[in-house]
Design a protein with these regions (language model features):
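Cofactor-binding loop segments of dinucleotide-utilizing enzymes, especially the Rossmann-like FAD-
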Residues: 10, 39, 150, 178-181, ...
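Conserved catalytic-core segment of NTP-binding enzymes
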Residues: 23, 112, 117-203
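Short, hydrophobic/glycine-enriched beta-strand segments
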Residues: 4-9, 36-38
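N-terminal phosphate/diphosphate-binding loop that engages ATP/GTP or pyrophosphate donors
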Residues: 18-93, 97, 102-105
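C-terminal binding/interaction regions
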Residues: 192-225
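Short, hinge-like loop/turn segments at secondary-structure boundaries
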Residues: 51-57, 164-166, 192-195, 221-224
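Short, high-confidence coil segments that cap the C-terminus of an alpha-helix
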Residues: 2, 32-33, 106-111
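Glycine-rich phosphate-binding P-loop
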Residues: 6-20
Length: 229
């Protein structure tokens, strides 16, 4: 039976793709058949004359996933904007059915699917006709989430807002990861302590050198999948 997790963030460019890649690489190193999936990617790149899904390609390389990265993304959009706007500009429409189909395909290949979101948790995928938001996808797939946030000043507000929105939408959060964490920073250490106290959730850290406690990640994410961690 496939299990999965959805990686979201407090915003754009806080390190969601990097954390996703580290989690998958760590799980694979622990003997877990883990894979990657993303519903929509904005801002394709060109490599060796071929259009590629940059985030997916990075994760595949970093984590050592075999296969074609572009096949791990349902909708690839050239314009680097919110998926709903990029799709509108390219005369495309993002709908739920293909996303579910592609996630199920990934679930047939991997025992654990790490799905990366686009931007933050409040991300529109389609606003023309039937509205489709990222939370609709998370709920349709019945996934829990990991919230990635920057460790610096302002993260208490953005992290708690993201968490409370998820809770209001009946989406469970498995843990929070503070990225670019500097243990010598009083602000970073206090942010971690305050967020743990105010949320009751485990707050993990990814240091400035990119270290992440993958054994703890494994225990948190796979608690319901494995009889023994």
């Amino acid at each position: 039976m496939c299990k999965g997790i959805f990686i979201t963030a407090t915003g754009t460019d806080v390190g969601k793709t990097y954390i996703t890649a580290r989690i998958i690489k760590g799980l694979i190193a622990q003997g877990i058949n883990a894979g990657y999936y993303k519903a929509a990617l904005s801002g394709t790149e060109v490599e060796a004359g071929k259009k590629i899904a940059g985030d997916a390609a990075y994760v595949f390389r970093f984590a050592g996933i075999k296969g074609e990265p572009n096949q791990a993304v349902t909708t690839m959009l050239d314009y680097p904007a919110s998926p709903h706007l990029a799709a509108q500009m390219e005369n495309k429409r993002i709908t739920l059915a293909p996303i579910i189909q592609d996630f199920d395909r990934a679930a047939s290949i991997y025992d654990y699917v790490v799905m990366e979101g686009s931007g933050g948790i409040i991300c529109p995928l389609n606003l023309e006709g039937t509205t489709l938001m990222l939370v609709d996808v998370i709920k349709a797939l019945a996934l829990e989430i990991v919230i990635v946030a920057d460790a610096g000043l302002g993260t208490i507000n953005s992290t708690l807002l993201t968490l409370e929105y998820a809770r209001s939408m009946k989406i469970d959060t498995r843990c929070i990861v503070l990225n670019r964490f500097d243990e010598s920073s009083a602000i970073h250490c206090d942010n971690k302590k305050v967020i743990e106290t105010m949320t009751g959730l485990e707050v993990l850290v990814c240091g400035v050198q990119g270290d992440l406690d993958i054994l703890l990640i494994k225990k948190i994410l796979l608690a319901n999948l494995l009889d023994s961690i």
